[in-house]
């Protein structure tokens, strides 16, 4: 069970054992098929995945704060909230490389003193962090999305250096900075 379940809005069924997740999904899919298909069809059921955790190969994390005017956070949106962010340092749907990159980026962002982009005020720098890891090659691509309003080359240089120093299972294939 994911330790962030309940607060984090990223997953729906992480509070259930995998077998219960499968049963629920199978019931939902079977119901949709029954309603969508006219006539008889062969139902083969839902096949379990051999990978039950750390199965995501791409994630987009958001910058924000965990509560109004709180410290900068980097993670997923809180359940039911478009503004508040949950730091997901122990997210179960990504592997350890994602967590290391997430922690490194959050630490560098906090040390920089730069602010997250505040949607209501239209101020700040940090928007999103995208991480992608190829399943077969384990090549990792990281993309930091920021605003264009701040010249933060010193932060970017420090952040890239820290990322390249991480001990990862995968191989860092690219580090991007997207201004948006």
Regions found by a protein language model. Give the residues of each.
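Accessory RNA-recognition modules of RNA-modification enzymes
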Residues: 1-180
């Amino acid at each position: 069970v994911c330790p962030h379940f309940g607060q984090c809005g990223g997953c729906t069924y992480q509070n259930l054992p995998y077998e219960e997740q499968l049963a629920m999904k199978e019931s939902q899919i079977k119901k949709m098929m029954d309603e969508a298909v006219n006539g008889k069809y062969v139902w083969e059921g839902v096949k379990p995945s051999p990978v039950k955790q750390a199965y995501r190969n791409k994630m987009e994390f958001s910058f924000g704060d965990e509560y109004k005017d709180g410290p900068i956070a980097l993670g997923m949106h809180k359940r039911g909230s478009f503004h508040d962010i949950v730091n997901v340092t122990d997210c179960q749907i990504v592997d350890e490389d994602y967590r290391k990159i997430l922690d490194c980026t959050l630490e560098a962002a906090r040390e920089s003193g730069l602010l997250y982009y505040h949607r209501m005020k239209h101020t700040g720098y940090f928007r999103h962090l995208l991480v992608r890891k190829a399943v077969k090659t384990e090549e990792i691509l990281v993309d930091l999305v920021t605003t264009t309003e701040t010249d933060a080359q010193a932060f970017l240089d420090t952040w890239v250096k820290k990322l390249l120093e991480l001990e990862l299972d995968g191989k860092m294939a690219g580090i991007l900075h997207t201004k948006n």
